[in-house]
């Protein structure tokens, strides 16, 4: 196969995946969800929250100290007394705030990533794309491509890669749009927020192969949806169990065999909690807005190793994709 032929096939795969994405019954809901997130970012307003760059001393005064010294004296020293609000949805939601504007933006972004690239955003992406493989294997393109001298494994991998491309395009619109809307609304441009796009794509690559395998095995969209959500939930529970064991006392910890089994499962499966912690660290919010205590302790003690977590998660996805390709070689499935 020449390079031009490969690109032509990938172009066909990507075009078909885009068609499936737009034709999906979830596409209108996806558009509404994305518009809602971007609108929420665009309507952020700050009341009485200054920028840290406006002060020589980038720190705020505690309430007790402010009451003792007085607002005027603090202002002379370059230390502001902040008693502001974060306002969302044109003021419908108000959150009291006592830190600088940059901190308020990081706080909002730390909440935003939960709905764009972390748990909610990833699960939405898995549900949206779950039907692509079953539909592809029963459709026109699959039957046409099988007439060419191409292996079924190559076609499945090409289709999967095209779905990752489609997901990435949507991620650029959702995360990029949210970042631009928030930057225009607040005049604070935090480039670290864009790490959430990379984490979304990597997480999708790690978890979507389970949906590919289930779709290949069952040819059912519903099985792929339920199975991929269940797979994510199992991975989350295993990840949480390991972190809990690390932070537990001797009396509270599991038995030796249980710990051993949990560790094997942890290193074998993708690690959603690790991804959340890694993203928080990349965005620079992990200490300012820390995760649950057990998670933070595991991170600070070096028990969560970013490169090892991501690497082993990607290896597990490769293994699942290999099983998916083997499933297609079953004569009954072809």
Predicted features, each with a name:
Residues 116-137, 311-331:
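Transmembrane alpha-helical segments in integral membrane proteins
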Residues 20, 134, 145-147, 211, ...:
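Helix-capping/transition residues at the boundaries of transmembrane alpha-helices
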Residues 30-35, 222-235:
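Central hydrophobic cores of alpha-helical transmembrane segments
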Residues 45-79, 90-107, 230-326:
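Terminal transmembrane helical anchor/hairpin motif
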Residues 15-33:
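Membrane-interface helix starts
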Residues 1-14:
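Short, membrane-interfacial amphipathic segments enriched in basic
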Residues 14, 132-164:
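Helix-loop-helix units of permease transmembrane domains in multi-pass membrane transporters
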Residues 39-49, 60-61, 76-132, 156-223, ...:
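Secretory targeting signals
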């Amino acid at each position: 196969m020449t390079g031009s032929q490969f690109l032509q096939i990938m172009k066909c795969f990507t075009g078909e995946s885009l068609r499936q994405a737009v034709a999906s019954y979830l596409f209108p809901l996806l558009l509404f969800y994305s518009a809602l997130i971007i609108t929420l970012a665009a309507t952020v307003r700050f009341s009485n929250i200054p920028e840290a760059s406006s002060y020589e001393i980038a720190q705020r005064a505690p309430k007790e100290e402010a009451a003792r010294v007085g607002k005027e004296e603090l202002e002379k020293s370059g230390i502001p007394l902040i008693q502001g609000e974060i306002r969302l949805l044109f003021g419908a939601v108000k959150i009291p705030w006592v830190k600088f504007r940059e901190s308020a933006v990081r706080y909002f972004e730390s909440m935003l990533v939960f709905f764009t690239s972390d748990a909610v955003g990833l699960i939405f992406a898995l549900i949206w794309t779950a039907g692509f493989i079953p539909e592809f294997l029963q459709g026109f393109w699959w039957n046409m491509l099988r007439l060419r001298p191409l292996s079924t494994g190559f076609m499945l991998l090409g289709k999967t890669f095209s779905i990752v491309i489609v997901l990435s395009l949507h991620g650029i619109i959702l995360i990029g749009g949210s970042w631009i809307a928030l930057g225009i609304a607040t005049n604070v441009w935090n480039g670290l927020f864009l790490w959430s796009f990379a984490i979304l794509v990597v997480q999708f690559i790690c978890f979507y192969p389970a949906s590919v395998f289930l779709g290949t095995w069952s040819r059912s969209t519903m099985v792929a949806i339920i199975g991929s959500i269940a797979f994510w939930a199992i991975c989350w529970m295993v990840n949480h169990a390991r972190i809990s064991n690390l932070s537990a006392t001797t009396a509270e910890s599991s038995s030796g065999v249980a710990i051993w089994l949990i560790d094997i499962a942890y290193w074998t499966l993708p690690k959603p909690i690790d991804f959340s912690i890694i993203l928080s660290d990349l965005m620079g919010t992990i200490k300012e807005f820390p995760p649950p205590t057990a998670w933070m302790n595991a991170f600070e003690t070096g028990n969560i190793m970013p490169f090892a977590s991501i690497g082993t998660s990607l290896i597990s996805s490769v293994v699942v994709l290999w099983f998916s390709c083997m499933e297609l070689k079953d004569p009954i499935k072809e």
